């Protein structure tokens, strides 16, 4: 079975080669998201990555659309994807990475790391005039308990 696959993800050469080797009967085109062309979207049976909605909606034969975001609401509107198109998304792909980044930012804020960095860049070595804060016993409000919102409290041991 021959399929035409448009990949709109920033893949390196090794990942491209691995993808092509996994299904040698498929034909691939690789575009970085900032450089997606309408003719490539119209050519494709499968689109991997968030091609512009305006282009996706013009492809009436697309069979599978893989969104690289967890919230693909724009693609779910009537008329964007054909009725028989399978759509998948990246729910669950970012919870660990983003929640660890959030934890790093929270620690940085609590410990005034950004103020210290700014003072260091200005060659000011005076201490910051306020008590040091920590995260032990701190309270955090998580709004939204999707993959990221439920991962963050676990990382913070709350």
Ranges and model annotations:
Residues 13, 38, 95-96, 150:
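Loop/helix-junction capping segments adjacent to catalytic residues or to phosphate/diphosphate-binding pockets
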Residues 130-158:
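Rossmann-like dinucleotide/phosphate-binding beta-alpha-beta segment
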